[in-house]
């Protein structure tokens, strides 16, 4: 398993007859599958006509730092509410943050296959008997709102690939006389992986995960749920995933000890296999030493279920639908500086829609409204300091023309509320915080985001000839290895595009760090040669893949050295889970005093996913609406909004 491996049982459990206790009569309660903490249906609040609330103080001045998906969502939902004095500041010359969709042919005017260098597979939290856009998630809501096209993601080990090749220990797993690549064909979605060793690992993983899913689904959002989740957290918050894998399995779950589901009971040899290639669908090694609550949240609560590839705001031919500024020569911020114009292809289309698509409530887009103001949207502007003033406003200092040091100018502006969406290491290393008292910003909060663990990640993408997926029957569509390249994905967006794509290497943490010294060109060459070597060494393959790959057009992304990110996903180590939760509590406990709102994946416990970005943005909007006495829609009040729980 990788961070985005498929585990679909949470989407099927309610359909397959699991007992589900009725949730409370609260219309804002979420349903399973969904994240475990608040059991709050954010979609129900956001999808209302006129949005979350109606502003009674529309001139309340709001600054949003970062134009990734979190910042863009916050800007759109605040504008829907009627707030009109919004300033969005972005350090780079593009929007989207770690939604980084790179055109495979940057100078082509024809629609073509993109490379998703950041997030690439999206859970919609839909159940098995409903389409993705009916999932009770904000991803489902925005995909429906913006008419995004999508398809099932071609995950290793899933039914959405023709076959998955598994190459471990130089092809010796399986006990053949010659090196072999094990071939996993899973057309029905329930076929176990090949080989006795892998099947033992698969059985132990599935027994643990299925049992936990059944019991969680039964009690989720019921009156007993909060106590059960607290018991689960108490049992596992200090346990690493490595230790969970080897922890003895339970014979049966005991309702008198509801948080204890035991472990997977794997032997050292089985754990080594699971570390290297999961159940044949990708390595979990990069996450072995993080708090086990992270992979449990990912698998059990729907983040791994029915994952989707976002094609963009496109028609069946893969061409963009009529959309704002699609044919503009350039787009400009409030100062007249240009930034990357929208293409509406790939996941970036989501971010582009958040900024450029008109809102029903206002008749114009966030972009159009921002352009009417001298400070509505500022790109190429790096925030350097936040200073609390005696009048309770926050002064935001930023360097304009950040990318041109010889022309950089320092500016500042004063705001009533400031939403910070940046990766936390950027906050620590780039932004000075001044005059914030302990009642506003406790040292415990600062320590929690300073000591957060940011994962490294490296992706190597390249164009792939159409003939590989159309005619090749020998080389598996997805390949999982214990080599330095690790996982290989190939997939198609559209028949009409001139080429497909190959994710030639996808690595995390130590596996990504060990590739850091190679130049992009060296790394691409090494990955192609290594994949050829593996395929030629496997007696049942004996064919190179490099003739299908556009090596010279390959693109490499290393997130830890990206100056706009300093990491790919924020995780947490054993014993630090409550530090991470405290960051999610900050907006409710301190923001009304400090004027600061922390939002997004950086301040969540579900690393590497887009849904917590949406929810963090909406959380900030809820609290700003509450602070400014906005009128909530749909009868919602803060008493309907659950609290995050720390240790009792």
Describe the residue ranges of each PLM region.
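Mobile amphipathic helical/loop "lid" adjacent to a hydrophobic cofactor/ligand pocket
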Residues: 2-13, 24, 140, 144-146, ...
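Conserved flavin/dinucleotide-binding core of flavoenzymes
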Residues: 3-49, 81, 393, 413, ...
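Glycine-rich active-site loop/strand segments that organize a redox cofactor
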Residues: 5-15, 97-136, 157, 220-231, ...
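N-terminal glycine-rich phosphate/pyrophosphate-binding loop and immediately adjacent elements
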Residues: 53-221
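Short, solvent-exposed loop/turn segments at secondary-structure junctions
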Residues: 69-70, 93-94, 106, 122, ...
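Mid-to-C-terminal "cap/lid" subdomains and adjacent gly/pro-rich loops that border
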Residues: 147, 161-231, 372, 421, ...
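Active-site/ligand-binding neighborhood in enzyme catalytic cores
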Residues: 217-385, 389-394, 400-404, 414, ...
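Mid-domain catalytic core of redox enzymes
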Residues: 379, 384-503, 507-510
């Amino acid at each position: 398993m990788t961070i985005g491996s498929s585990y679909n049982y949470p989407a099927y459990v309610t359909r397959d007859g699991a007992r589900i206790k009725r949730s409370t009569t609260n219309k804002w309660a979420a349903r399973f599958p969904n994240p475990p903490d608040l059991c709050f249906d954010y979609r129900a609040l956001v999808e209302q006509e006129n949005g979350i609330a109606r502003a009674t103080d529309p001139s309340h001045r709001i600054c949003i730092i970062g134009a990734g998906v979190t910042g863009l969502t916050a800007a759109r939902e605040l504008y829907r509410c009627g707030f009109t004095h919004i300033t969005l500041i972005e350090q780079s010359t593009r929007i989207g943050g770690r939604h980084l969709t790179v055109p495979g042919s940057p100078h082509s005017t024809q629609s073509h296959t993109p490379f998703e260098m950041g997030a690439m597979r999206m859970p919609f939290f839909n159940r098995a008997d409903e389409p993705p856009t009916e999932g009770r998630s904000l991803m489902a809501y925005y995909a429906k709102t913006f008419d995004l096209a999508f398809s099932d993601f071609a995950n290793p080990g899933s039914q959405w690939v023709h076959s998955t090749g598994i190459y471990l220990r130089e092809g010796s797993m399986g006990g053949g006389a010659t090196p072999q690549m094990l071939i996993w064909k899973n057309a029905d979605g329930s076929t176990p992986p090949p080989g006795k060793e892998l099947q033992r690992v698969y059985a132990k993983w599935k027994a643990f995960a299925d049992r936990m899913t059944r019991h969680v689904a039964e009690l989720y959002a019921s009156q007993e749920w909060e106590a059960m989740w607290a018991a689960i957290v108490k049992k596992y918050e200090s346990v690493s995933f490595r230790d969970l894998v080897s922890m003895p399995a339970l014979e049966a779950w005991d309702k008198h000890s509801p948080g204890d589901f035991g472990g997977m009971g794997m032997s050292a040899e089985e754990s080594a296999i699971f570390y290297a290639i999961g159940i044949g669908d990708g390595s979990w090694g990069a996450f072995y030493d993080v708090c086990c609550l992270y992979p449990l949240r990912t698998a059990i609560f729907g983040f791994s279920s029915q994952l989707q590839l976002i094609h963009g705001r496109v028609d069946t031919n893969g061409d963009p639908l009529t959309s704002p500024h699609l044919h503009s020569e350039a787009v400009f911020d409030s100062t007249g500086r240009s930034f990357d114009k929208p293409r509406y292809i790939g996941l970036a289309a989501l971010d582009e829609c958040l900024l450029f698509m008109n809102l029903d409530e206002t008749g114009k887009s966030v972009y159009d409204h921002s352009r009417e103001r001298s400070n509505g949207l500022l790109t190429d502007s790096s925030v350097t300091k936040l200073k609390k003033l005696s009048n309770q406003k926050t002064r935001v200092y930023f360097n304009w023309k950040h990318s041109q040091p010889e022309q950089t100018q320092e500016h500042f502006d004063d705001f009533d509320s400031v939403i910070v969406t940046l990766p936390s290491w950027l906050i620590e290393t780039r932004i000075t915080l001044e005059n914030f008292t302990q009642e506003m910003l406790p040292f415990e909060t600062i320590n929690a985001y300073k000591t957060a663990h940011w994962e490294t990640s490296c992706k190597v993408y390249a164009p792939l000839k159409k003939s590989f997926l159309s005619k090749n029957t020998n080389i598996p569509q997805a390949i999982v290895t214990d080599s330095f390249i690790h996982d290989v994905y190939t997939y198609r967006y559209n028949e009409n595009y001139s080429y497909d794509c190959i994710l030639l290497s996808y690595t995390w943490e130590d596996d990504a760090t060990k590739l850091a010294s190679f130049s992009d060109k060296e790394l691409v060459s090494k990955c192609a040669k290594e994949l050829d070597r593996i395929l030629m060494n496997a007696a049942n393959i004996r064919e190179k893949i490099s003739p299908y790959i556009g090596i010279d057009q390959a693109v490499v992304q290393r997130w830890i050295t990206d100056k706009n990110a300093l990491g790919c996903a924020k995780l947490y180590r054993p014993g630090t889970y409550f530090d991470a939760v405290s960051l999610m509590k900050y907006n409710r406990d301190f923001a009304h005093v400090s004027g600061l709102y922390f939002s997004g994946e950086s301040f969540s416990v579900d690393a590497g996913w887009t849904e917590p970005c949406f929810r963090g943005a909406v959380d900030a909007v809820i609290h700003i609406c509450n602070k400014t006495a906005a009128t909530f829609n749909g009868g919602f009040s803060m008493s309907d909004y659950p609290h995050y729980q720390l240790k009792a």
